[in-house]
Structures are given as structure tokens and as C-alpha cells.
Amino acid sequence: MASPRHILLINGPNLNLLGTREPQIYGSTTLHDIEQASQTLASSLGLRLTTFQSNHEGAIIDRIHQAAGFVPSPPSPSPSSAATTTEAGLGPGDKVSAIIINPGAYTHTSIGIRDALLGTGIPFVEVHVSNVHAREAFRHHSYLSDKAVAVICGLGPFGYSAALDFLGRHMKF
């Protein structure tokens, strides 16, 4: 029996504050709630889901590299380099089939994350909780959208479900 397709869900800076940060924009659903609902949906679709959140660009880039089987360079010691992964036992060779990424503010600034995604060749869906096009002008540009398989924004937490559903039902790996 084939192993389930493996999806990596990456959340960028400040998304750990969902549920408390600007609830008038982002709502009251926490990142933990989103991850739990995503795990349930992924399981029902026959997908394996790993979640990862970091406020640090380099950690996100390293995790994207790791998703393709590349071993990241040893991290420099830093007390602020915390990142969270909800699945134990991930190794450098634990490749994924697709990535769902909410890059947060790095959407508008990170050529490094763009290059990491392109360098691995892993298809990805870009997700945003808020409608970035209805917000400040600096949020209207994404360094990822033109290379994403799909872009979902403004659907609140449901955007993650829509991305998983698309990957599980419609994308061929």
C-alpha cells in the first residue's frame, strides 16, 4: 500500500498570535485550532499533514529545504530561534508532496522564501487569513503568488481547509 501523500503546512511570523492579534482582521480562531482542524481534514482526505510555524525567515527556508530532503546547515545558537513543528521524528529525508504556506509579512518581503520554494520544486498553495488586497497598499504585492499553484485569501481560517481540500481532491502528485 502506498504511503499517504505528505503535506507541509507552514505559518510565518506572528501567526502564532492568531486568536488574539487584531481579531477584527484575523478573527478569534487560534493557530492551534487551525492546525487541529487541518489535521482532521487531512486525515479524512488520506493525507499526512505536518505543521510548522516560525517567526524567523531562515527557519522557514530551512524547513522548506528539509521538505525536499535537503539537510539544512547546522543552526547558529540563538535563544530566539524557536520554531514549532507538530510532528515528531521528521528527518532531513522526510520529503513532502506539497506545501501550504501562509508566509505572513514575509509575503511582501522575502525573496529568500520564494527562492527556497522554487529551488525545491515542491508545488505550493499560498494562503492568507485576511484579504490582503483590501488592506494597506504594501500588502498588495506577493513574492510568491506568481509561482503558486493557487492563492487563497480573505476566507479566514477556512482558507486552510480550502487549500487542503484542493490538494487532496484535485491535485495529482
Swiss-Prot record:
EC number: 4.2.1.10
Record pathway: Aromatic compound metabolism; 3,4-dihydroxybenzoate biosynthesis; 3,4-dihydroxybenzoate from 3-dehydroquinate: step 1/2
Cleavable signal peptide: none
Disulfide linkage: none
Gene3D superfamilies associated with the record: Dehydroquinase, class II (3.40.50.9100)
Keywords from the named record: Lyase, Quinate metabolism
Active site residues of this protein: 26, 128
Protein name: Catabolic 3-dehydroquinase
Origin species: Neurospora crassa (strain ATCC 24698 / 74-OR23-1A / CBS 708.71 / DSM 1257 / FGSC 987)
Taxonomy of the source species: Eukaryota, Fungi, Dikarya, Ascomycota, Pezizomycotina
Gene: qa-2
